[in-house]
A protein has these predicted regions:
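SF2 helicase catalytic motif II
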Residues: 840-854, 869-870
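Pre-P-loop entry segment of helicase/translocase ATPase cores
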Residues: 645-730, 782, 794-818
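Active-site-proximal helix-loop-helix substrate-binding element of RNase H-like nuclease domains
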Residues: 123-127, 143-182, 384, 406-482
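Mg2+/Mn2+-dependent nuclease catalytic core
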Residues: 87-193, 334-339, 344, 349-365
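Long, highly charged low-complexity segments
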Residues: 244-330, 373, 538, 550-578
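Metal-dependent nuclease catalytic cores that hydrolyze phosphodiester bonds in DNA/RNA
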Residues: 1-125
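Accessory interdomain/linker segments of ATP-dependent helicases and helicase-like nucleic-acid enzymes
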Residues: 12, 29-69, 500-623
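Conserved P-loop NTPase motor core of helicases/translocases
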Residues: 759-845
């Protein structure tokens, strides 16, 4: 944002800042208009991120040049003349460079610099080519502000070349190019830009509110001072943004006002118990503000939470704390220090350092091996940590490095990890501004003395060490990590001191050990993987078949972890979880309704955001078991939501749930078994699945009438039909970006196959995509005079059912496995075509939108057919 000759000029980054914090826009506007000054705040972490972003951009540029691409660089001159830069950008585009770097755009009071313009073969006013925008971002995933920037650049680009591009790309730190379909975000861009313009024109009165952008903001200290001066209610520990908004509606805008609110005062959409907790929290903080006394009190006991979740001490206990650099490389971070405090007779600190990804793997293995070795001597030990980041990081490292899978799974099953932060928050309420480790240390008198005082400082220290290699920097980081471990130990000891003495210790968890049969199957799978991988060339068909054996188990792990994490959440946390419904109570006005041997119970709940729907498998978090079947849910027609829960005889004696959580991942045993069949076939070399092996080996398609190695690239539909009909135990890819007619083409290929008496399967990632293709197939078949009979697999829900002149739906898998030759078309998802009863039963399998299907699922489905069209 700048003012030039009394005119305000804006950039796409101003839109991103507005999206992050509307108050920031008003602060920037005041500085631009000379009504305020920018604080002299030095933000080293923000500078580090800017530097890393520039490294990523420079590396991408170097790659383009190394590939021999022609790159024209447009640089602003010292006067930062955007109009001249815009002219030079247009000249580079007219010259037809492969890439234009630092492309400048200026129009209608907006200006910006796009990282790259990429030439594509699409005619425009420039000639037989045009350009699309690429922007490099250090992020791991695209964010809304990226779409705003790309929309601005693409709109300006469209004016220059007199052709609007269809796509723009975010080049992430991982080097993955993520396409943004501009038609999908144009309305969003226009709406945000209009809101931004209105806010600038009206000089809207805004207030600061803590957000993610604060860590990088020049005005952070200014905002914190204002919040303190105003005694803003946002300063109440653990209060959420939605709760702040609801309190403001009833006139409660200060911490003092909340603390002095009369008990029982209702606030819409805040549960009474939650409001009482917030009021008590504000009261404790107010006491500390006025007297300096840090008071606390124990919360009411809850089964399995707070003090009731604190296990007894064991001689083998450990405390664990991690230090990581999130942007060690643009593509990935580095966990550079694994610190452990061994709680023997005399606590002993041990550090596992890592300065590259191989070192990270060794440090991770060293930590896991250390814990397992102590477990053999002390089977009841626990690993204490503060916050959930440590276990989640270990899970990620296990997946990234493909090592110690079984050992980490074993630790998780045994519930070895104990999050003292979660226990503290449900055990006590204290007059602290937050429940971070640094703030709660005052409860047990821990005082830090190290040079490094925060995780951000540790990252900056480590970044300096990477450039200077001064060992003193590592010593200071290690001292900080050691203090974190000792502070966590101090919290553990304090919790044990204040724990109610008459409270029984929690029972040791059931480790959920695998059955002997499951263990035997897993061992056999591991042995098969080893046989395939050992000695095989990486990325070869044999190697890939071995690595894919574990794909579905790896994919299911995060869903299981999220599920078990959900089981341990408090009602307040479940209220904010979209995979759950919290605060359920029985609807006294609606008695249970008998349905055969089951009862349909009606429960009510406060309106909340959730994704739970009829048919969603739901569990009771109190038991970790099924809560019944949701047959109806209504949260749009009243002040309270209603859910009808059908419970059979086995649930009759159990209490009705007080919350519902989505179950674990969908059963994928059929897909796992199909991939296993393929892997066994490749080990045996029996040639059972030649098309699948050809895909893994990246062999050219084998087509009757086409010479080996001959071209199979064509845009002619009749030629495509001939290729599909000539498939000889092989595969074809239909390629093209969204909206280029792949479904239209696929339908015509399917009808051609059906017309020749072939038995065809239709698959996709979703029922909606399948229905879309089936509708086109029936239309084409009618026009071509092709008559056939088809079956579509449904799951029992209405949105999975399809009915047409040739195709009917059925939810019984046996009907598909037993279907005779009169049924020429079968349609369904991976759960259908992976079944052993369909192995080899089809001539051709067409997988629509195959780009959205994992390789493992495509291969699992492919076991049903001789040929694949993807």
């Amino acid at each position: 944002m700048q003012r030039v000759r009394e005119r305000l000029l804006f950039s796409p980054s101003d839109l991103g800042a507005f999206l992050a914090c509307e108050h920031l826009t008003q602060l920037e506007l005041a500085v631009t208009l000379g009504e305020g000054r920018r604080p002299g705040y030095e933000n080293s972490y923000a500078e580090l991120l800017r530097s890393k972003g520039q490294e990523h951009e420079a590396a991408f540029l170097a790659t383009l040049r190394a590939e021999g691409r022609s790159v024209v660089e447009v640089r602003l001159d010292g006067r930062r003349d955007f109009e001249a830069g815009t002219r030079r950008t247009a000249e580079a585009m007219r010259a037809g460079a492969d890439y234009v770097y630092q492309a400048v755009f200026f129009a209608d009071g907006w200006r910006g610099i796009a990282d790259f313009l990429e030439r594509v073969d699409r005619p425009s006013a420039l000639g037989p080519w045009s350009y699309q925008v690429l922007d490099t971002k250090l992020a791991r995933h695209p964010r809304p502000e990226h779409a705003l920037q790309l929309s601005f650049y693409s709109q300006a680009l469209g004016h220059t070349q007199e052709l609007s591009p269809d796509l723009a790309y975010v080049v992430l730190g991982t080097r993955v190019r993520v396409p943004i379909r501009l038609a999908d975000v144009t309305a969003y861009f226009r709406r945000v830009r209009e809101r931004f313009g209105a806010a600038v024109t009206a000089r809207s009165r805004t207030s600061p509110y803590p957000c993610d952008h604060c860590a990088f903001c020049d005005f952070r200290d200014l905002c914190e001072d204002r919040l303190e001066q105003e005694d803003h209610v946002v300063r109440v520990a653990r209060i959420q943004r939605g709760q702040v908004k609801r309190l403001l509606v009833v006139g409660v805008d200060t911490l003092t006002g909340l603390a002095e609110m009369a008990p029982g005062t209702p606030v819409a959409k805040i549960a009474p118990s939650t409001l009482d907790g917030l009021r008590e929290q504000a009261g404790l903080q107010l006491i500390r503000q006025r007297t300096g006394a840090l008071e606390w009190h124990a919360l009411d006991l809850e089964p399995g939470r707070g003090f009731a979740a604190l296990p007894p001490r064991s001689p083998g206990d450990l405390v664990f704390d991690l230090e990581g650099h999130p942007f060690f490389e643009p593509a990935r971070g580095l966990e550079y220090l694994f610190g452990v405090l061994l709680l023997d007779d005399e606590p002993r600190y041990q550090a596992f350092w890592a300065h590259d990804h191989e070192g990270e793997r060794r440090a991770f293995e060293g930590l896991v091996d250390l814990v397992h070795a102590r477990l053999e001597r002390h089977p009841n030990l626990h690993v204490y940590h503060f916050s959930g980041s440590e276990p989640s990081t270990l899970k990620r490292l296990m997946a990234e490095h493909s090592t110690r899978d079984a050992q980490v799974d074993d630790l998780l099953r045994r519930q070895v990890f104990v999050d003292l932060h979660a226990i503290l928050r449900r055990a006590v309420r204290a007059g602290v501004p937050s429940y971070s480790l640094k703030e709660v240390e005052a409860l047990f008198g821990f005082v830090r003395s190290g040079a490094v005082q925060s995780g951000t400082q540790a990252i900056l220290h480590y970044e300096r060490w990477l450039h200077q290699k001064a060992d003193g920097l590592l010593d200071e980081i290690e001292a900080y990590n050691r203090e974190d471990c000792r502070a966590t130990l101090g919290l553990l000891e304090w919790l044990h001191r204040v724990r109610p003495t008459d409270l029984a210790w929690p029972e040791a968890p059931d480790p959920r050990a695998l059955s002997p049969e499951a263990t035997e199957a897993m061992d056999a799978r591991q042995l098969l993987r080893q046989e395939l991988v050992d000695g095989a060339e990486p990325e070869s068909a044999r190697w890939l078949a071995g690595e894919l054996l574990e794909y579905h188990r790896r994919e299911a792990r995060p869903a299981w972890w999220a599920y078990y994490d959900r089981l341990g959440k408090s009602p307040e946390e479940l209220l904010e979880d979209t995979e759950a419904i919290a605060y359920l109570t029985v609807d006294r006005d609606t008695p249970p309704e008998a349905q055969r041997r089951s009862l349909a119970h009606t429960l009510i709940f406060p309106i909340q955001d959730h994704k739970v729907r009829p048919g969603t498998p739901v569990h009771d978090p109190a038991t970790g078991r099924t809560a019944g079947d949701i047959v109806e849910i209504d949260d749009t027609s009243g002040a309270l939501g209603r859910v009808r829960l059908l419970r059979g005889p086995s649930l009759a004696s159990r209490p009705l749930p007080e919350a519902l959580v989505a179950g674990g991942p969908i059963d994928d045993r059929a897909q796992r078994a199909a991939v296993l069949r393929l892997a066994e076939s490749i080990r045996a070399g029996d040639g059972r699945y030649p098309a699948l092996r050809a895909i893994l080996a990246r062999e050219r398609p084998s087509i009757l009438g086409v010479a080996p190695g001959g071209s199979v690239q064509t845009t002619d539909v009749e030629a495509m039909k001939a290729l599909a009909l000539g498939l000889d135990s092989s595969y074809l890819f239909l390629q093209g970006p969204p909206g280029t007619g792949k479904t239209w083409t696929g339908a015509r290929l399917v009808v051609a196959l059906l017309g020749r008496g072939r038995r065809v399967g239709i698959a996709a990632q979703s029922h909606k995509a399948i229905h879309n293709l089936l509708g086109e197939i029936e239309k084409v078949a009618r026009d071509a005079g092709v008559v056939f009979k088809g079956l579509k697999k449904s799951s029992g829900s209405s949105d999975s059912e399809y009915a047409g002149p040739f195709i009917t739906s059925d939810d019984d898998n046996a009907r598909f496995e037993q279907a005779g030759p009169d049924v020429q078309l079968l349609a369904g998802t991976a759960w259908l075509f992976s079944r052993p009863g369909l192995d080899g039963r089809l001539d051709d399998l067409v997988i629509d939108e195959a780009g959205q299907v994992s390789l493992a699922d495509a291969l699992a489905m492919g076991t049903a057919a001789r040929n694949l069209i993807l």
